[in-house]
Amino acid sequence: MKKLLVASSASAALFAVGVGANAHAAEDNNVNQDQLAQTALNNTQQLNDAPVQEGAYNIAFDNSGYNFNFNSDGTNWSWSYNADSSAQQAPAQSTTQEQAPAAQQAPAQSTTQEQAPAAQQAPAQEQTQQPAQQPAQQQTQQPAQQSADSGSNVQVNDHLKAIAQRESGGDIHAINSSSGAAGKYQFLQTTWDSVAPAEYQGKPASEAPEAVQDAAAQKLYDTAGPSQWVTA
């Protein structure tokens, strides 16, 4: 299905907006990784209520058997973690928030799953296109195993939910063979690259986890409006 494109700078995109280079890169590397990892594992509400630090940052590291990522463009922030390659698989966790201007912090907009006590986990495997799937429902604490791209803690508005159903039936791996549009929201590649995190740019949206697709769609909706989807 043909989409309208949005002109923007791919280098300025981040997790909810795309992740790009910024003047705080050196500062990001000086965070206390042990403390930040423990906060993500045991005090998720603190990360939901406020960013790791003021301004833009892009922090990624391995600690305590998990891979951690913390991102902000100075306005929106997000964080996530999943298991490293040495353990048994358990639910991955991520969240995206909007940062209030200056020193004032905006209230948290989304909830996360409470993480079970630390256990051995294995890395989630990225999947290619799969048969149509229904969106995973957010659940409270569960020990059951699931892949990192199933379900999403990113909250999108009701209009976007309806758009996703009309575009792909909610299938995050859907690909339109005619237009090349891909993913839950049927992004064209150039549009996807303008709002996707750096590590997913240049790849079809269908290869990104559902949380990443949701965050990118909400950003596109907020900045360019629903006219980007012909089914809107």
Swiss-Prot record:
Cleavable signal peptide: 1-25
One Gene Ontology term, aspect cellular component: extracellular region
Alphabetical list of Gene3D superfamilies matching this protein: 1.10.530.10
Region described as Disordered: spans on this chain: 84-154
Keywords: Glycosidase, Hydrolase, Secreted, Signal
InterPro entries: Lysozyme-like_dom_sf, RPF
Lineage: superkingdom: Bacteria
EC number: 3.2.-.-
Subcellular location, record wording: Secreted
A UniProt-annotated Pfam family: Transglycosylas
Gene Ontology MF annotations: hydrolase activity, acting on glycosyl bonds
Sequence ranges of Low complexity compositional bias: 87-148
Major localization class: secreted
Family, as annotated: Belongs to the transglycosylase family. SceD subfamily.
Role: Is able to cleave peptidoglycan and affects clumping and separation of bacterial cells.
Protein name from the UniProt record: Probable transglycosylase SceD
Lineage summary: Bacteria, Bacillati, Bacillota, Bacilli, Bacillales
Name of the gene encoding the protein in the UniProt record: sceD
